[in-house]
């Protein structure tokens, strides 16, 4: 499910592509329902534009949610899937370097919603340097 809007953002295309790839790969990896739903849509307010990726996968437990951006953290129930704990860590690190926000809302067994936030009035680019 993809809803489109005419919202332009200025950021580093390569790194944004990498961030979105990590988020979408995570969503696809943790689908656990027969009917899989992955939605992408934008939102806008006075201070920012956002890209939202929402799935109906297994969700993230409330106890794991505060740790999902930690390097190497794979969650308490991730033994079924090969995980390194690097995907969301890298996505968050890159968002921070680009001046973007990254927010996650989830309910275990129901959904995960990841929002990439682009503050208005700034250009978000990153020089070629190490992100780790």
Segments (PLM) and residue ranges:
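Conserved micro-motifs of the catalytic ATP-binding
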Residues: 4, 8-11
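Short helix-loop "hinge" at the ATP-lid/N-box region of the Bergerat-fold HATPase_c
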Residues: 27-28
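Short beta-strand/loop element within the Bergerat-fold HATPase_c
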Residues: 37-47
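Acidic ATP/Mg2+-coordinating residue in the GHKL
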Residues: 55
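Short conserved segment of the HATPase_c
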Residues: 60-72, 130-131
């Amino acid at each position: 499910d993809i809803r489109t809007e005419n919202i332009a953002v200025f950021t580093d295309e390569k790194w944004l592509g990498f961030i979105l790839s990590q988020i979408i790969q995570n969503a696809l990896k943790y689908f656990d329902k027969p009917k899989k739903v992955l939605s992408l849509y934008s939102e806008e307010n006075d201070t920012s534009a956002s890209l939202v990726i929402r799935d109906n996968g297994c969700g993230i437990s409330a106890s794991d949610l505060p740790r999902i951006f930690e390097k190497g953290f794979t969650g308490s129930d991730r033994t079924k899937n090969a995980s390194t704990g690097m995907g969301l860590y890298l996505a968050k690190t890159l968002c921070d370097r680009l001046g973007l926000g990254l927010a996650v809302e989830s309910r275990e067994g129901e959904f995960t919603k990841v929002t990439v936030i682009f503050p208005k009035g700034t250009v978000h680019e990153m020089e070629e340097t190490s992100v780790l």
